[in-house]
């Protein structure tokens, strides 16, 4: 069984190890109320300047519905990354539906800060 072909526009795509780490952090962020689910809410966090980083699903159909986010991220200097599955992203966000984009938000005194910073660096390495 081969993995389905991923749209080349979904760049940078996280590998299996980074995806697992990302989804774990997304799950923790949901518990700490530091998560915004959905493309529209992710856009709002970017515009308000409260996004730590953005995670998008590479299998969003059509992909163009989330491709405004990387442009906005680059304007705001926010790291962004794609994971393969919207189903997995939805589960990590703690909802029963697929999620095509989510934003981990800034929170003062958050216990997730060290993990968030190390993931931001990993994502930025992908973008180079």
Swiss-Prot record:
Keyword set includes RNA-binding: yes
Major location category of this protein: nucleus
Question: What segment(s) does the record annotate as region Interaction with U4 snRNA and U4atac snRNA?
Answer: 36-48
Q: Which cellular compartments is it found in?
A: Nucleus; Nucleus, Nucleolus
What is the superkingdom listed in this entry's lineage?
Eukaryota
The protein's UniProt keywords, in alphabetical order, are: mRNA processing, mRNA splicing, Nucleus, Ribonucleoprotein, RNA-binding, Spliceosome
Which Gene Ontology terms of cellular component type are present?
Answer: nucleolus; nucleus; small-subunit processome; U2-type precatalytic spliceosome; U4/U6 x U5 tri-snRNP complex; U4atac snRNP
The subunit structure is:
Identified in the spliceosome B complex. Component of the U4/U6-U5 tri-snRNP complex. Part of the small subunit (SSU) processome, composed of more than 70 proteins and the RNA chaperone small nucleolar RNA (snoRNA) U3.
Can you say what this protein is called? NHP2-like protein 1
Q: To which species is this protein native? A: Xenopus tropicalis
